[in-house]
Amino acid sequence: MNSVPKPQTKRRTKPPVPPQKSPALTGASLDLLIYLALVLATFAVYAQVGNFEFVNYDDVDCTIGNPHVQQGITAQGLEWALTSRDTGNWIPLTWISHMLDCQFFGQDSGWHHLHNVLLHALAAVMLCIFLERATGTRWRSALVAFLFALHPLHVQSVAWVAERKDVLNACFWFLTLWLYVRYAERPGTGRYLAVALGFCLGAMAKPMMVTLPLVLLLLDYWPLACLGQRGRKAIWEKLPLLGLACAGAAIAYLAQKHAASVNLVPFDARLANATHSYTLYILQTFWPARLAVFYPYPRDFAFALLPLLAEGVLLAVVTTGVIVLRRRAPYLLMGWGWFVITLLPVIGLVQVGDQAHADRYMYIPMVGLLVMLIWGAAEILEKLRAKRLAIPLAAAACLASAVLSWVQVGYWRNSETLFRRALAVTNGNKVANNNLGSYLMDSGRLPEALPYFETAVRIDPESAISRENLGTALGKMGRLPDAIAQLQIAVRLSPDTLKPHSDLGTALAYAGRLPEAAAEFESASRIDPNDAIVQNNLGLALSGIPGRLPEALRHLEEADRLSPDPEREQVIAHLRAKQQ
């Protein structure tokens, strides 16, 4: 029997399953990746500092050479940090951070350097967090933060241990701005007090916080756009912060005067230098070439008139332009205001120190220029319908900055590489000649050191430090008459400074002129009675003068009280026996 075939039914096929896509990164995850990339990029450029030495330009005075800091965290050290005006600044938090380094890392200069790098990376992350919260734009904020982290003009603030105050202050600066954005979103007493606390902590790291209340007003204009809505309240609420800022400025000025850092530069020269420096900082932001640790003032404070007028006109044109465009592009007014205002304390109208300008002064102010650049470039690319160029242009800018910074960081390896570079890219640099000479002298390379000290004296014959260094080098080379002549000039130029008197006393003692040597040590002792070395040398000089042995013993015993020394105790015992 033939089987009847079953009727065929159409097979139902399942619809094709679309390929599974990996879930997109959430906003928070993407932000974390950006922050991680910022930290990694920063350490990629700066990790080399882990093998660097302290440089002989304030590093040792701020760390292992400072008796209050080198002991780490102690009750006496904390009291000193809160009251000290050393280095011409009131910066207790910065001192405490150096104490922590000495507590955990001792004299290992590499770890002191890496602490700076960590704080710089943290500041870049805080900048990114603040800008994204304030503007609502992730990638523009991230690019500003990357350029901040990688820009060569910031190398001085990071690779120089003594500039710990820059990177520490920046962390509190950006934290305070983020806290202020939160306060502006939902005002309240608690949030306002958080802003005030951040401000105070930043001021305890570096006095640059003095301009922050004015920057908050700029943020009210853009990007927060709340200045018109809140009216006078936006101004009144800044007054307590302005009061704190004025108090901080007064403390900083008095500290600088106490440290004799406020120099008498003619006002017309200061005004000319301020105009030139504003223009130069803009140029160095976009073309960071020939950077140095120290830039001297022009000889006799002479500025060329026509270039100076051109720079003044340029600044006036930019200022006018950002005001005219304030409604169409409000970020320009905010960025320019940020740049101009935050530079005011260090632009040189009140001259502090010998420098004409400094890379480190752009650490915070550069953010204003970067905001103008990034937001402006983004708008231009949108109008040109060329947004696809944004990523390659941003990558090129970051890569170029990273490469240039890597090279610039290398100059900070030690004092010799740092100051040889400064001499290569500047003229008439007394500081670079003195510091390079000092490094060579301390390394036992006296014949190499001498020409640098002689050059420093030629640049500024009225510099007590240059005369003192030259005299010390000549003395170590056995040229005592020449050494004494230079040190006598140093004493005349700086009669209230301890070291010239002490060095002259040492040279006179080696020359056998003990009464004159004792007189110089006595002058040094009057300046600082608690200097053990001066007391020791005064005692030794007096011990060689007939009839003055009791005085000699008194000073040697005082030296031993200040700094106990077994060898000195043997000398004291010998002199006591001789006295009997």
Task: Put a short name on every predicted segment.
Residues 2-478, 492, 499, 503:
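Polytopic membrane enzymes that build or remodel cell-surface glycoconjugates and lipids
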Residues 431, 464-465, 498-499, 532-533, ...:
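Boundary/linker segments of alpha-helical solenoid repeat arrays
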Residues 442-443, 476, 510-511, 544-545, ...:
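Register position in tetratricopeptide repeats
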Residues 544, 550-580:
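Terminal, low-structured helical/coil segments at or just beyond the last alpha-helical repeat
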